[in-house]
Amino acid sequence: MLPKRAYPVQDSNVHSQEKKIIAGNWKMNINHSQAVSYLQELNWRLIDNGHDFDSCEIAVFPPFTDLRSVQTLVASDDIQISYGAQDVSAFSDGAHTGQISAQFLKDLDCKYVLIGHSEQRCLPCYPGNNSAINELNNKHDGLIANKLLRSFAAGICPILCIGDISPGDHFDATLSRFRSVLSHLKAISDKKHSIGYALGSKTHFLDSDQLHMLVAYEPSSAINSGNCANSGDIVRMAAAIKDIVNVRVLYGGGVNLFNASAVFNEDLLDGILVGRASLNASDFASLIKTCCL
């Protein structure tokens, strides 16, 4: 058995030392050959704009089929853009057709992986059957917790996406789901001491430790809408998440050239996750420039 606290944590004051991050989620766009020209253009535009990579990290999340091309280009051209995958399997290996393990992603030098994005976590509609919906939510939370543990074990930093499942959800419902994932994380890790997980007491989850992951708050009502959530709601959610556990928090959903800077520069936020507005290298470079002026 590994000693407790063998899990990936950082000192509680690390937040103040870490740079902010602007990440682009390509979703199911941009093929492997387009990815090469995209990254080359984004890189030279950032350099031409005088971007300070030491103060603001830039990351992209290509489709799985692009990752080898991205890895080769980043290594050969010494590009200072991080990258990650859009999902990961909850299993380490075996008969799981179509799934990609965390170790496979690590072998491709992925730094990050998105976990629990609402577009991955859509639930079927069960009119009037709240118990069925709750049961499915519970299973999803357990699956997500396993994905987190697989990422930790492989040395990849997960970005846990949380948000309302339906437009009628409230602030407390989103936080309840976040707590549920952490609760599953604790339950699983208590049974898998080889991973060395031990959760402390702060709000029944963590004490002064920081899980080596990020949390992206993405309300479903804002995703693909072109409109961000209310700034007050964003800050309130970021504060509530950080009160539960010491993690860095990003915002995603409706981020574009015109609202990105205001959201990015909120004191309690550690960065933004951009979708549609990151699909064109020139436009994404302009968005980054407005945030980092």
UniProtKB/Swiss-Prot annotation:
Q: Could you tell me which Gene3D superfamilies the record lists for this protein?
A: Aldolase class I
Subcellular localization is given as: Cytoplasm
The pathway to which it is assigned is: Carbohydrate biosynthesis; gluconeogenesis; Carbohydrate degradation; glycolysis; D-glyceraldehyde 3-phosphate from glycerone phosphate: step 1/1
Question: Which GO terms label this protein's molecular function in UniProt?
Answer: triose-phosphate isomerase activity
Which superkingdom, per the lineage?
A: Bacteria
Q: Where does substrate bind?
A: 25-27
Family according to the record:
Belongs to the triosephosphate isomerase family.
Q: What is this protein called?
A: Triosephosphate isomerase
Metal-binding as a keyword of this entry, yes or no, is no
Give the reactions, separated by semicolons, that this protein catalyses.
D-glyceraldehyde 3-phosphate = dihydroxyacetone phosphate
Query: Keyword set for this entry?
Result: Cytoplasm, Gluconeogenesis, Glycolysis, Isomerase
Question: Which Pfam families does the entry mention?
Answer: TIM (PF00121)
Query: An example Gene Ontology cellular component term from the record?
Result: cytosol
What is its quaternary makeup? Homodimer.
Q: Name one GO biological process term.
A: glycerol catabolic process
Note whether Cytoplasm occurs among the keywords.
Answer: yes
Enzyme nomenclature, EC number: 5.3.1.1
Please name the catalytic residues of this protein: 117 (electrophile), 218 (proton acceptor)
Q: Which organism is it from?
A: Tropheryma whipplei (strain Twist)
Function of this protein?
Involved in the gluconeogenesis. Catalyzes stereospecifically the conversion of dihydroxyacetone phosphate (DHAP) to D-glyceraldehyde-3-phosphate (G3P).
